Amino acid sequence: MDIRKAYLDFFASKRHEITPSSPLVPDDATLLFTNAGMVPFKSIFTGEIPRPNPPRKTSCQTCIRAGGKHNDLDNVGYTARHHTFFEMLGNFSFGDYFKEQAIAYAWEFVTEVLKLPKDRLYITVHENDDEAFNLWQKHIQKERIYKFGDKDNFWQMGDTGPCGPCSEIFYDQGQEHFNSSEDYMGGDGDRFLEIWNLVFMQYERSANGVLSPLPKPSIDTGMGLERVTAIKEGKFSNFDSSLFMPIINEISKLCNKTYVYESGASFRVIADHIRSSVFLLAQGVSFDKEGRGYVLRRILRRALRHGYLLGFKQAFMYKLVDIVCDLMGGHYTYLNEKKDSIKEQIRFEEERFLSTIENGIEIFNEELKNTKEIFSGEVAFKLYDTYGFPLDLTADMLREKNLKVDEEKFELLMNEQKARAKASWKGSGDKTVSGDFKNLLEKFGENHFVGYEKAECESKILALLDEDFKEVSTLKDAGWVMLENTPFYATSGGQSADSGFIAKREVLDTQKFFNLNLSFIKAGEELKVGTIAHARIDAEKREQIARHHSATHLLHHALREILGSHVSQAGSLVESNKLRFDFTHHKALSKEELESIEKRVNEMIINSSEAILENMPLEEAKKSGAIALFNEKYQGNVRVLTLGESKELCGGTHVKNTAQIGSFYIVKESGVSAGVRRIEAVVSKAALEFVKNQLEGLSKAKDELKNNDILSGVKKLKNEILSLKNELKNSSKTELDSKNIQGVEICVKRVDNGDIKAMIDDFKNKFAKAVILLIQVKDEKITLAAGVKDAPLKAGALVKEAAQILGGNGGGRDDFATAGGKDLSKIDEALKQSLETIEKAL
């Protein structure tokens, strides 16, 4: 049975609009990942945006719980139901139906569609929710309905805001299988399994804790697909269901070991973690040192360590991508499109970690010998800092030994490292925004962007806000303006904001806050709420931005055409004088590839294709072949831009014809993170300036080289440098005088020119037995080097002794060592002491 489809079809038949799963990276700064089905609708529940039409929605939402407040990572593999990635089935009502229908729908689906036995079902309600208790009695005997308090049956989004009682449906897995002391309704055992939570959002909690009834209560429900699939298939663990067993069987085949549930935690960890890795990578998250990318790295490295326990010594996770795509690509079709790119990124990250995992485990095992209860925080930090072991990976390894890590010491060292990094950081552009945008929305609704058609207009000032986003009636200082109709494009989709003027006040920036388009203005003449003002954008700047933005679309198309369909946009920045485009690709681009891409973009520009803009429903746009971006949130109708062969969803401003772009030049190609590359480029006037600068640079090079043929001039210069280096090297050989003691040639000397390492090598090659120590001063920096050949001394000890006299330190091998010093006044003393040490040893 396809439970996912059955659920969505059922609620569609109840007049719910099916909403596609939102991105795992939410449009919510407070969340690391989308971790519940209601997250995409949060701003509707809180009243920040108006209720949708229709007011009923249903979805199967992909979710991640690994990192942040909701973090199940440590438990995955050791329990029957914890996952880093899961799918949440949900139905939602925004001020439409309430408890009676929500309960009736849930009961109908569970008993008539899933056909779960009624005698296995139990219900919980809030202890004060008599309404829900009575409604449930229409479907089930009251002896099967249990009342619990706030801890179990009251839901709230935060300390303030919408909240309400909830009701849960439980499934009895059978007394014959579960009979511990905790296996009762309300206990911590596994016999009674919660399968569906119905939240009745009927109150608003104020800052002082008072609950006030909402005028239009709402419904938010959630049912885990993995859990209900296991129940429907008669399995006691989600991992034994058809969603996971094909992956586990593939792991078993790859490692040539049989999966046994009791000892199979490593199989389960890998099966879970490959699902989350595939989905995160498919949606544009890349392996990184921080943020979401670091959570992804932790997930994969935890799986690799468990693979190591199963005997995998080479990359193997990438081989599991196919089975995940086979299982889930039918519903999430983008997985198949990204499959090759996902494999490459996983393989690259695997090989990177596998090169250090063995050394890291050796260090872990050495420290384990000295550990009684608490593992050293210093060693845990070393494992993290040097060998790439996330703390939770070390903790996971210790868990198997019933030990813990000194997290306090680890965090102390981590904070010290962060402080050092912060000290070298120049600052941040981050700013906390705390304005009453909900009030503005209620008063005025969303204001209108008219900038697609107009560069200037007369418009009413709806609201004025100071720099701290507090509403004011008049404004002379710098602050924010909300116009009824605005020609100013707000920073969005990588495109930078317009600038210009409102009245005589200069507009420096325009941003969107909860779909309100607000412009930031410099201090100047007084503006008043309710008056009409003339708004005018900087049309020349807009035109240059549009040219660069259209070029990113052509670049994206060229990249996919030349490198492959695995390429997808991972970020962009569009300004009036440059563009930056990040994209998924597993390796640096060759000179030939860059030349082909640049040439292809210029061909599309020369083709003079008209820009075609269309508005259509999202699903229709996708069917037409338009490319949508995962990190963008699309609602209702979408704007589709066709530029020649390129077709993408985009809300930005663009040229009317590709010929207006002028010409396109790639300035730089670089890596952003594992699996993500970046191209920086220029078009139009910026391209002309780039070419002009290149030509000026070549002209200056000709003048400096005194040669019109630059390549010939550079070659000649390189030959001269090589000749001078050889002369210097040869001259250094003749500068060293020495004496012989007991058949050993000795040289202790200060030399301020030449390569002292080369001098020492030459000296040692010249004699059968030799000891040499040289001190060199350059730019008041002291360098020492010593060499020993077939003599009873160690170069490391010799150079260390001399360096300490000079206020420095150093060391090295027995035959060669280097050091540094600080005190120039003690060079003679150091030379004298070194000579005495050598003579004594001989």
Swiss-Prot record:
One Pfam family per UniProt: DHHA1
Is Transport there in the keyword field? Answer: no
- Residues spanning the membrane: none
Q: Which SMART domains match?
A: tRNA_SAD (SM00863)
Q: What is its main location?
A: cytoplasm
Record's Gene Ontology CC terms? cytosol
UniProt cofactor(s): Zn(2+)
Subcellular localization(s) per the UniProt record = Cytoplasm
Positions bound to Zn(2+) = 549, 553, 650, 654
Report keywords, A-Z.
Aminoacyl-tRNA synthetase, ATP-binding, Cytoplasm, Ligase, Metal-binding, Nucleotide-binding, Protein biosynthesis, RNA-binding, tRNA-binding, Zinc
Record-linked InterPro entries = aa-tRNA-synth_II/BPL/LPL, Ala-tRNA-lgiase_IIc, Ala-tRNA-ligase_IIc_anticod-bd, Ala-tRNA-synth_IIc_core, Ala-tRNA-synth_IIc_N, Ala-tRNA_ligase, Ala_tRNA_ligase_euk/bac, DHHA1_dom
Q: What GO molecular functions are on record for this protein?
A: alanine-tRNA ligase activity; aminoacyl-tRNA deacylase activity; ATP binding; tRNA binding; zinc ion binding
What broad class of enzyme is this?
ligase
Q: How is the cofactor bound?
A: Binds 1 zinc ion per subunit.
Which catalytic reaction applies to this protein? tRNA(Ala) + L-alanine + ATP = L-alanyl-tRNA(Ala) + AMP + diphosphate
- Listed GO biological process terms: alanyl-tRNA aminoacylation; negative regulation of DNA-templated transcription
- According to its UniProt record, the EC number is 6.1.1.7
What job does this protein perform?
Answer: Catalyzes the attachment of alanine to tRNA(Ala) in a two-step reaction: alanine is first activated by ATP to form Ala-AMP and then transferred to the acceptor end of tRNA(Ala). Also edits incorrectly charged Ser-tRNA(Ala) and Gly-tRNA(Ala) via its editing domain.
* Domain notes for this protein: Consists of three domains; the N-terminal catalytic domain, the editing domain and the C-terminal C-Ala domain. The editing domain removes incorrectly charged amino acids, while the C-Ala domain, along with tRNA(Ala), serves as a bridge to cooperatively bring together the editing and aminoacylation centers thus stimulating deacylation of misacylated tRNAs.
Which family is it part of?
Answer: Belongs to the class-II aminoacyl-tRNA synthetase family.
Q: What is this protein called?
A: Alanine--tRNA ligase
What species does this protein belong to?
Answer: Campylobacter jejuni subsp. doylei (strain ATCC BAA-1458 / RM4099 / 269.97)
Upper lineage is:
Bacteria, Pseudomonadati, Campylobacterota, Epsilonproteobacteria, Campylobacterales
